[in-house]
Amino acid sequence: MLPVAVVALSLLGSASCFAQKPVRVYILSGQSNMVGMGDVTGRSSRWGKQFRDPVVSIYSGKYSPKADYDKLTPVESKKLASIGGTRPTPFPQGGTAVLRGFVKMETDGTYGFNPGYQASSYNIMEVAGQEVYRREPGKQAVRTGFPFTGGKTYPFKVTFLTSQANGLGWVGRTDIPGTLATLVKQDSKFPHLVDKQGQWTVRNDVTYKGVISAVGQGPLTVGLQGNTIGPELQFGHVLGDYHDEPVLLIKASIGNRSLGWDILPPGSKRFTFKDRTYAGYKDTPSSWIEGQPKKKVNWYAGKQYDDYVRAVHGVLDKFGSLFPQYKQQGYQVAGFVWWQGHKDGNPAHAGRYEQNLVRLIKAWRTEFKAPGAPFVLATIGFGGWKMDGPHLTVAKAQLAVSGETGKYPEFKHNVKTVEIRGFWRGVEVSPRNQGYHYNRNAETYMLVGNALGQGMVQLLKNRK
């Protein structure tokens, strides 16, 4: 059971309780899975072939909630060649528009509807007599999923509440296994992520700032990165619960990057593997055969490392203006978080991963003037316990640097690796077949974030 998080700073008391205590800054980095690829919901698509025989009827006068439009005679009715897409058949103008027809989904599941767009989104939609969508002017939309049997046809009706009416709309399955919405709102996991109204909770004591990619900024909540989450979500909850001080998460990450080339830390030397020479820091290209012309590329070993460092410094240098509420308190770099390794799944880079990781840990601490600051990392977990080949070499290298192994005495009590292969979830219980992104299963990202958070707390306690 994950720790139940405190939702809002207001529940802890006023912001004055944090006065004079520096904000605890955690720097998170890696590649695409640190960016965050856990799906929050299933993807919606524009209305299209699911909708059959659409007819729009126009009734006299403005919309009235007392009117029964199924019993009234329309002024005009028009069969529509199509609805949805990007250019639905235009509706006749004037009066109150009611769209009727039939809808069929090919796959069993619960589906959610978003009829209309902008001004035309003020409407009420029913499927088989059950209200699935309602948005009244000046109010937020209320949605209720409808359970479809694949291949079965159901009648639908959309009653528009204003003169703005059209056939635009979106639909998506809401019970896709492995999405955060399904895990939380249907499977009752991670209850601290929703409030009593079923809305995503907001942590006003934990601030997120993304650079390079996943560039949202604001109090920690679901949605800062659009429709995906990374490990920072649960990590932030764990550290927010642990600290009395405010917490700032700075995440510098981007996909398709290797430690052996893109994020190669300063001090890394060239090496030879089989018949090729591999780049040291600032070298280009990534590898070459001695005596042969080098391929010209617009990149160099460690370029992404340099970009990460520059971006994080850009946040810290502007701390007071970016976070004026904490300007007087200042900040302290409290720790580092690392999750990366897929791109190093080749024999040459996998064999150097351990020494590159050791250099990265030392370089990160030196760069941000945080000697001995806790450094927690997660193994890769592709395929779970069935992992083999170069990726297994990478995972073993990640485990080797953990302080408790004793292999690196200077890392004792201040570096910890968490094993996450047990958090792998198969495609049959996940949103997509995308193994390099953990099948986009949000549970994996939550569990990784929790393990990283608990690991960081353990290291922090070691310092006391």
Residue ranges and their predicted role:
Residues A15-A19:
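Sec/Tat signal peptide C-region and signal peptidase I cleavage site
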Residues A8, A81, G101-V103, Q329, ...:
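Alpha-helical interaction segments
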Residues Q20-V55, S60-S64, N166-K464:
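Cell-envelope and extracellular/periplasmic
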Residues P3-S14:
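Bacterial N-terminal signal peptides
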Residues P22-R24, L28, N33-G36, R46-D175:
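Extracellular/secretory pathway-exposed regions associated with glycan biology
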